[in-house]
Amino acid sequence: MAICSTDNELVELLWHNGGVVAQPQAAQARVVSSSGRGQSASVLTGDDTETAAWFPDTLDDALEKDLYTQLWRSVTGDAFPAAAAAGPSSHHAPPPDLPPPAARPPMRSGIGSSWTGDICSAFCGSNHIPETAAQRCRDAGAALPPERPRRSSTHDGAGTSSSGGSGSNFGASGLPSESASAHKRKGREDSDSRSEDAECEATEETKSSSRRYGSKRRTRAAEVHNLSERRRRDRINEKMRALQELIPHCNKTDKASILDEAIEYLKSLQMQVQIMWMTTGMAPMMFPGAHQFMPPMAVGMNSACMPAAQGLSHMSRLPYMNHSMPNHIPLNSSPAMNPMNVANQMQNIQLREASNPFLHPDGWQTVPPQVSGPYASGPQVAQQNQIPKASASTVLPNSGAEQPPTSDGI
């Protein structure tokens, strides 16, 4: 920005270190740039029409060079201290070569382009110089990525690319740490999944082993139960066969039928025993309630008609079973069961046996035994009375030899 002062001098306002600096100008401000072929070009500030009238035409080139050198040094002295140490062949101090950005590969055209940004608000220019071997090596060294990001990129598998001795690192500020954390997270997830798989396998193995153990235990218990049940059935079958042998004319095979036959056989045996006891005068030894099963015709029946009663004398008498039974009539409730009546019944039975012609076909009659005791029955007394009568009415044959001498014959 150019401002005219009161002394008809051109004053230029420059931005230097955060402040505005006013500097007088006596010559036309030009920016000279040198190329590799030695040509120079002047670049005006874009305000040529306004400033051309203030510069005289008689100024020589030496004055212009001196003014430009002073102006350039004052502007770039503080911003670029290394510009004063440039080569002596150039008539102005070139700006220092900045390293190219990390994302841009080096130029291959043989001509390096360097530009300076934010030098001043009024002057801007480009300086094209031929590229030398030292400069090319320096550019290649600056373009090479550092060693540490390359190791992290090889560990991560992405993020670096190199070609022809030069490379570029994309996102070198945050990718290594993020990739490392992602790798660690992935490793933790893998380890957790492996541990969970191992735990699942262990639980499945324990469950399968417990199932096998439980199944073995159940099968063993079932085998023991089957064996004990088989033994019990064998014992029952043996007992049933023995019972079947005791029952006459039993040809049943099933257990229920065999038990029914045994019950019926026991009932018939009990009835026969009770009848035999009644016919042989063993009424006091009768079972309670057995008289109701005895038929009336059995009372007073001849013992000779019942062959089974002949051997009852050899049997040992059983004790009296005094068990209470429902609807039982006591044995001594009737007067017929008294001892006197029992003795009379026995004598009557013996008298009928003695007078039975079928039992004594030869006419021989047995003399009934005399019953001794205070209880003398009526028929016994009558029989004793008949004996003297028979002896008195009987005529005995007389023989002389046998007759005793009488008193008449003396």
UniProtKB/Swiss-Prot annotation:
Region of interest: Helix-loop-helix motif: 234-269
Keywords tagged on the record: Activator, DNA-binding, Nucleus, Transcription, Transcription regulation
Major localisation: nucleus
BP terms from Gene Ontology: internode patterning; negative regulation of red or far-red light signaling pathway; positive regulation of DNA-templated transcription; regulation of DNA-templated transcription
SUPFAM superfamilies linked to this entry: HLH, helix-loop-helix DNA-binding domain
Extra facts: Overexpression of PIL13 in transgenic plants promotes internode elongation. Expression of a chimeric repressor in transgenic plants results in short internode sections. Alteration of internode cell size causes the change in internode length.
Subunit structure: Interacts with PRR1. Interacts with LF.
Name of this protein: Transcription factor PHYTOCHROME INTERACTING FACTOR-LIKE 13
